[in-house]
Amino acid sequence: KTVQALSNIIKKLEATLKTRITHVYVGFGGQSIIGVKNTNVRELSTESEVTQDMINELMDANRSMQYPDQQILDAVTLEYKVDNQYQAEPPVGVPCKRLEGNFLNILCRREFYRRLKKCFDQANISILDMYISPLALADSVLTDSEKRGGCALVDLGADTTTVSIFHRNILRKLSVIPLGSANITKDIASLQIEDGDAERLKLKYASAFTDGNDIDQARHYAIDSDRFIEMSKFVDIVEARTREIIENVKSLIPDEYSEKLLGGIILTGGGSNMNNIERAFRLYTHIEKIRTAKFVNDTIKSTNPLVNAKDGRLCTVLAILAKGDQNCAGSDIASSLFEGIQTTQQGQATPTAQATSAKATNGRIIDDAAKEKTQDNAKADDNGRVKVESSTRNEQNDKPKQPHKLLNKFKVLFRKITSPDEE
């Protein structure tokens, strides 16, 4: 099903854009990822100055850390400890007898990652790069001052809620809660209501917080022409699940940072559109500074109403789009008899130094084998394309130019119509 779904998406996009799609960028997120801290220590026999090689050895040792059934997608350096002193930057040149490196490893289930890549391979879709979605999202919706001063980015999705904690420009914690706005819909549907009607009621009437004085005990919401639900019961259902999600978010904020989040909490995602969501977060987290990121910081021009709605639902997709630095489009698709097949190099994927680097940055997922394969394929495609175009140009130069056969037929027909000898 996944393979078929991927193929259908590509076909629909190509039909809409009238352009071949040669490569794609992929965002990796959801319940499959988690951030886990790890510490590596190097004891020195005598006091010595820290070298870059020592730093690299700590990082390599961390990368080599084995987790049961999981693999490291990316590693964030949290801090270094030189004897008893903590340092944010690599302490090269500092004398010590004990060097410690603290890291946040972002993990995913190894089998899930393998199956995901296999689905793309079976669908014949080339992956140009993979990004960890929460990190890409953070780069697109958070300000520098929020990351520096400390903040919690909360992505309220349909099935999951992702919490990313930043402080001093460093990701400190990454967690995914298996609860989202779809759970609210399911709770409403549990009252013998169709899923579609439950979703409609949620979008129209749901509020993350309703003051007791605003609840009208005599008011009912229409489910359909014959059925109604009491406002008070509806409010209780929505607020109970919303509060559960928010309290789970609060529990994931480490005590050491609870008083240091100068940037407050930033909400995004489709669930952030619920009425009074900011008020509910202030009430249950006791953090006063709350804002909602409805759109990415990048300037994006589009005629698509979903993009222009700027309601937070597409922030992650647009964030991954902003990360891409290569064109994924291939040749144009001919839509009529008179449109020839155009040869273009704009969709050619030529790996840059950044794309083929052995180290992942800004949430880019490390996959050396895939990078080498992409680079080799791109070079082969480049050489093949150049040869074909060169051969085609030579053939065209050698052949005398002749009118198109269909054009000749039109000329003959036109002469018959306009001939003065015609009876």
Predicted regions and their residues:
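A polyampholytic, Gly/Pro-enriched intrinsically disordered region
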Residues: 73-75, 151-155, 200, 308-331
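Glycine-rich phosphate-binding loops at beta-strand->alpha-helix junctions
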Residues: 28-29, 207-209, 261-284
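Phosphate-binding glycine-rich/basic clefts of nucleotide- and phosphate-handling proteins
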Residues: 105, 110-118, 134-135, 166-242, ...
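Residue-level signature of catalytic and energy-coupling elements of molecular machines
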Residues: 26, 120, 155, 188, ...
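N-terminal phosphate-binding loop and adjacent alpha-helix
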Residues: 1-16, 185-189, 303-311
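Gly/Thr-rich phosphate-binding beta-strand-loop-beta motif of the actin/hexokinase/Hsp70
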Residues: 24-30, 144-173, 188
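Conserved phosphate-binding/catalytic loops in two-lobed NTP-binding clefts
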Residues: 52-56, 284-317
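Nucleotide/phosphate-binding catalytic cleft detector across ATP-hydrolyzing
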Residues: 1-23, 28-151, 208, 231, ...
